[in-house]
Amino acid sequence: MINSFESQKVDNDYKIAAFYSFSPIAEKVITTFLSKLRIIAEKHNVRGTVLVALEGINGTICGPVEGVTAMQKQLDSLDLETPLEIKYSYTSRQAFRRFKARRKNEIVTMGVENVDPCKTTGKYVEPEDWNAFLDDPLTLVIDTRNEYEISVGSFDGAVNPRTDSFREFPEWVDKKLHSLLKKKSFKKIALFCTGGIRCEKASALLLREGFPEVHHLHGGILRYLEEVPENESRWNGECFVFDQRVALNHKLMPGVYKLCFACGMPLSPQDQNGKYYIPSIQCHHCVDLFSDDDRERFRERQRHIARLGERFPGNSIWPSA
């Protein structure tokens, strides 16, 4: 299903497309396909990342509208069994520094064998039905994202597995999930993530582990924010995204969070006003992690980026903090 944020186009010259599909892709077509993507990206000033594996494709790209359209035509040439889940948004500046197109073992890395979302996944929950799952006392709602993402925003009552990477999620399932289900006799599990890809793969894992009633939010948080009116929304905070917008508000526009470019952690306005925060140099998360020599390197990096910004104004929003 294609979702469009056409209302954001005013005064925003760059289009962002986030997409994925769990569909089998033949090894013989991957190398040629990636080469064609690189050619299109170079021609049309499209940046971002596209990952392709035997299990499917996953990516986020940003560029002029005509460039993103050209890329999508190439994506469509794969003729996937499961259509791409695509979400669009707009920004006033380029959201990525470069373009990468790579062949990977997994399009989202879980690191567990015999989990195949091409064959088996949980049941989709459409955004308009999600609030009912949040309210259901017999449904355990789980945020499959990482701790630093959840710190920016989440749904009230959702379980936080406190993982630092998606690779840690299977271990959390093995050690914690059974006991959580027994505590309140939950009958269903409902998973969610940013755009749908991690919770879809997580649902395949849970089904393999024998959990019977597994659901996941179709299109993830981003589609929920797009389709559910703000006055009906149960979302709190902002949604962390893996590009230089850092986090999006309910209108799917860049919010108030910035990124510490020393350690990569998201920073709230309160964090940005903290005594340890120096833009692009350090924050309260990393003040004790780096030496004075490190900080001097960060300052030199920032001076270099500033010079590039003077040469190429408006071409990138890196860095923001």
Curated annotation (Swiss-Prot):
Residues 135-233 form the Rhodanese domain. It catalyses: uridine(34) in tRNA + AH2 + O2 = 5-hydroxyuridine(34) in tRNA + A + H2O. Keywords: Oxidoreductase, tRNA processing. It comes from Prochlorococcus marinus (strain SARG / CCMP1375 / SS120). CDD domains: RHOD_YceA (cd01518). Its EC number is 1.14.-.-. It is an enzyme of class 1 (oxidoreductase). NCBIfam families: PRK00142.1-4. Belongs to the TrhO family. This is tRNA uridine(34) hydroxylase. One of its GO terms (molecular function) is oxidoreductase activity, acting on paired donors, with incorporation or reduction of molecular oxygen. The gene is trhO.
